Amino acid sequence: MKISRREKPLYALTIALMAVYFVLGCGIFDDYGCGPDEGIERQTSLVNFRYTIERLRLPVPDRWTTFLAYLPDLKEYRDRYYGTALHQPLVLIEAMGNFTMPARDFYRMRHFYTFLNWYAATIFFYALIRRRFGDPLTALIGWLILVLTPRFFAEAFYNNKDILFTAWTIFSLCTVDRWIQRKTVRSALLTAAVLALTVNTRLNGLAYLPIAIAIYFISALRTKEKPRVALTQLLLIGFLFLIFLIAITPNLWESPLPTLIETFRFSAAHPNHSAQGNLFFGKLIDASLSRRYVAVWIALTTPTGYLILSAAGLILFFFETFRRRKTSEPRPSQRSDLLALTIGAVPLLYIVLRHVTIYNTWRHCYFVYPTIVYFAAFAVNRSISKLRAVPSPNVRAGMAGLAAACLIAMIGESGVWIARNHPYQFAYFAPPARPNAEAFSGDYWQLPDRKSVV
């Protein structure tokens, strides 16, 4: 992508901000406590590691065998349906030290690893917005909104399930968009691998494959793509996805189809350990029974300005889509917008309408946040386009200054709050919700207490 002379300072600023965020993450990843999921995820990863060694008959040191012998067999393990492919590199690092790593060190390692995944995802998100709108300023603002969201800022270090899934949702969004655009074997291979890792991280990701196929099919119909080419691509992506998913999920190795069906059943009847344990408007409720639960929590814990921008972007998207509905040739940008919308909305609607079990606030639905930020960037881009079209230089400069001041105030407020409340950004409530924050769940993971233990 060619960079114009006018854009070079903006790119330099973007690179500098990304570098600052990375250095900051490297400096503060040890400031956060440990949630209960981290220990559980480590044990599940070790159980899968043991099964892999035994099933493939890999030669390993006796000290590994002795350590792993105390773990249950995967097929009898209660959490066997949870994938751990993304955590296996951490198990290998522990194994290199014969599993003698102190608890503090492997928790620190996991925090840093979770941050690396999230950091990479933010860069991919920037690239997605840059490619979609062709404007580096829009991409930078979108990136800043994603990074400077208080709860995500904190959980990017210790939430090794929901944040990892959100990060890989972004990777999936980027690779699917590129696959539909390029239609090559290489892009199909990469997309299938990313989708498989996303599904392995959380079964909700299984919705992404049919969404990708449906949008590819719609795009193929509107562009009058040859049926044989389209069918080949769809069969290829489906086949590669299954191969990758089975390969990285040891629980599927013996009987892939029956075990996959068992996994679906387990997910549908998932035990609700937090039933009647979610403080919501001053009452303890079962979150899965309230259809407004997720929406309310999103409104409570996301900076209000971000949500207003996103709502405006969504309205503009539908307006532009219906205005162009008679256009014979679709724009690639419309495909990207539809993909971003459906990848967030479809799984969310399923969870809400089917009363799927939800634990603690809306963290099980964090995957929808990239969609929220995407349409906030949509609104920003349309505003920038309107400003650039103003004929009068003086009026244009005045309006641009006002818009810039509003954006700086909005994003800056979140950034200042993050800095002042470090490392307790997980307790963030949007300004309108703060007077009633005590009526809702707070530190459900007891992170401050766990920090003192570790």
Region annotations inferred by a language model:
Residues 1-8, 131-132, 177-190, 210, ...:
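Membrane-interface junctions at the ends of membrane-embedded or membrane-associated helices
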Residues 12-15, 125-148, 181-186, 190, ...:
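Transmembrane-helix signature of polytopic, membrane-embedded enzymes
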Residues 41, 49-55, 78-88, 97-103, ...:
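Transmembrane-lumen/periplasm boundary regions of multi-pass, lipid-linked membrane glycan transferases
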Residues 80-88, 99-123, 155-159, 309:
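Loop-to-helix entry region of an early transmembrane alpha helix in multi-pass inner-membrane enzymes
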Residues 112-133, 171, 175, 318-322:
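Transmembrane-helix motifs of polytopic, lipid-linked glycan transferases
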Residues 142-147, 174, 195, 199:
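Short helix- or helix-capping micro-motifs
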Residues 155, 162-166, 198-203, 207, ...:
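Hydrophobic/aromatic-rich transmembrane helices and adjacent perimembrane loops
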Residues 165-181, 190-195, 344, 371-375:
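Specific aromatic-rich, kink-prone transmembrane helix
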